[in-house]
Amino acid sequence: MSKYLISLILLSVISMGVSAQRITRQYNNVSFSAALKDLNARQDKYVINFVYDELEDFKVTKNIKNESVPDAIMNLIGFYPIKMKQVDNIIIVECIQKASNRMMGRIVDTRHQPVDFANVALLNVSDSSLVTGGVTNENGQFVIPCEVKKAIVKVSCVGYKTYCNAYRTGEVGAITLEDATINLQKVMIKGHRKYISRENGKLTLDVQNSNLKNIGKATDVIKYIPGMLYTNGKYEVFGKGEPVIYIDGRKQTNTSGLSLLSSTNVKSVQLITNPGAEYDAETRSVINITTVHHSLDGLSGIVGAEISKHKNLSNNEEVNLNIHKGALDVFLAYQYDNTRSDIRYDVNQFNYEQDTFHEISASEYSDRSRSHDYNVGMNYAINKNHTIGGRYLGSISNYKMLDSPFDYMQTYKNDELLTATDNKTEESEKERFHNVNLYYIGKLTDNLQLNLDADYVYAQLKHKQQVSETSRIDAVSEITHMRNDQRNRATALKGVFAWNMNKNDRLDFGTDFSKISSWGMSVNEEGKIADDQFKNKETKYAGFATFSLSASKWKGSIGLRYEYIHAINTDQGEVKNKTNYSDLLPSLSLSTMFGRVGMNLDFSSRVNRPSFRQLNNSVSYNNQYHYEQGNIYLKPQYVYDTELIVNYSIFDFKLDYQYIKDYIHPTVVAVSGKPGTVTWMSTNAKDFQQLGAQCVVSPVFGCWRPTLTVGVYKPYFTLSYNGEQLDYNHPYGLFAFQNVVALRNDWLFRCDFFWNIKGHHGIYEQNGYSSFNMMVQKQLLKKKLTITLKAEDLFDSSKLNDVKRVNFVAQNRKVNNFNRCIIASISYNFNSFKDKYNGSGSAEDEINRF
């Protein structure tokens, strides 16, 4: 049973007058666990706690002479990734690298003598980038924990020729170094670690070993993922839409969690553009953020403030605290955001239903949004195999339209002026959000782990709107009041098993359940629009399994996800739609290496279900000719996505083909009895296809790290417009050139250019727009204090301009969000704050659909 000993604790009775105990011992090629066990038995002043299996692979050869127990242990540790912590008479020894695999061996010379203090580096077999490394001990032995199953072992030592060879993880035996003749000269060697890599189809940014470490917040880090777009506060993966973001396995419902995470605490960021069966069926792309793990007891945190100037000033303040004591973590976070924003619309719309109605409108609004976000929770490690925790997330948000400098509309019927109005809009929203999550993470056996999550969610949105329309012709005013109230509730449970069947095979399987209800009403006091009461209910049962295997140069996985949905949509107390969805969604991944060229083939099938906003029947009033409404008959769309990825050195290529069945897109319908008046809503088309390609180049030139991303997508889509078939097939593209220069004395400079190239995005033909951004940053007080100055959209070139043609309406819309701005921020870190919550949440997809 010694192989499975969790910790060795020998209780000692310390009597008065006992002097300090010293140790003299000789250890020759014994395991670290055996040496600690021996030290513990030979004295009674200290109690040594450790995990036997964790340290057994580390061999030690050491002569201990008259040393204290702590000094003897530190002497044994040497260069191994092991740390010792002493609390009074308790000594805790643990491996600081918790990887599941280990590369182990012994370095000798041609005379079979051990080579000590040799550098052993593990390199990625695909691109030779550094994975991790270690140093040999006095007996020439090394043990290096790592996450990979195969790596290039590179051994270097002064006086010997460098050795390189590929091995599978485990015991590699003895490696012999040949002698080398060296002419010593004054030489400076400077290396650069590759910070963008691709493995098994997943694009990874090594944040800790790049200049992104000090960029600011996690929100800033994500912007520098190749192929990532950031427009008006939203992230979008090129050709894939909005991604789902995870932090340490915990799904994020908004960007507040990202803004509370400092980039210094981000270890890596991973982009998955073709998720497998383990992810929810509606997920088309995933961003996984892994944070740096700290184990220091005490208080840690971050405080920060930011001020920005667009047309108006906005400000943001935050404080995050984390208290870590032994097995308990308690964390609290609060953020206040006061955002002033401005937006201008210019709309030119033609309605060809029967007569020709031509609408010309222009409006500009200034509004304010104030929000309070808070997060409190705890994690408790019962022991090394079992952890429990919980958290509460809350948000209070209030929105109000402050001013409308101008808002007018002119309508022509068959080229004759029909109406001309000056409009005044007053609008406000109150939003409340509450989420309670409980979780359990347990290691049931050495090869089987279980994750459990339970969620309860409640959200409420109240919206009020008053639109005053004054005729320029007869000065008659007309007022329209709209009031909407929507509430959402969800409960969810999720369980996931991870079974390491053997060294090369793994099976992940799990299930989740959720029950959602959404209800509300819309009221028009003047009776122009019929009042409405709606209620939506949805129950979901889901299960998945993913089998992963590796053999020689090949790695692969096959997954299957099943979801059953029972949905009921009620309007005005009458059941309008009662549907059962039963979907079986397969996924497949295959990767290999041909020399230094890596290849990956992925296939996934997903389903995107309508949001409750798209389904509810309430009407939003824009003006007398323009409404917006949900569609209770809207069906889910099914996405089938195939990717081929090839990477070599600094180059990364991707080909992508997407087929979407029952494609969801905007459309327009006429309002009965009101000529010229239309309602915009979502509907389904038969299908949609697009073919895409993307190339990323990421070299390093000294202190300059440029990244070039070029991509293009060609859509294939046809709809009926004005009695004829219209193709929406113009390709759209992306060009991004990002540059970072790391200067001396902790100065950092960035200069980035983004260009979205004109083309069709569904029914929208979007004109090209661009953004040129600059940033300078300085760190002080040993990098605890960070001061940043940014200038975004310097040339004011990010204005949107699109044309949509559908059914009998053509609309040209120009939008100016006044993105040009200056941002100044300051943040102070103490003890490197990190949110340590380990739960993943089980209701996140339901929250997003609200």
Task: Pin down the residues of each PLM region.
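N-terminal export/assembly leaders
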Residues: M16-A99, S128-G133, R193-E199, G233-V244
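Short, acidic, small-residue-rich periplasmic hinge/interaction motif at the N-terminus
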Residues: L36-Q43, Y80, Q86, I90-S100, ...
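N-terminal periplasmic accessory domains that precede
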Residues: I91-I96, G170-E178, A218-V221, T255-S256, ...
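Short acidic/polar hinge/loop motifs at secondary-structure boundaries
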Residues: V143-P145, Y224, R250-G276
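Surface-exposed extracellular loop regions of Gram-negative outer-membrane beta-barrel proteins
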Residues: T290-A305, R344, N348, I360, ...
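Face-selective signature of the C-terminal outer-membrane beta-barrel domain
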Residues: D373-N398, N423-Q572, M593, V597-G598, ...
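Outer membrane beta-barrel strand-and-loop segments of large Gram-negative receptors
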Residues: A490-K494, K540-A542, K635, D641, ...
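Outer-membrane beta-barrel signature, preferentially recognizing the C-terminal barrel domain
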Residues: K535-E538, K576-T579, V607-K661, T679-G692, ...
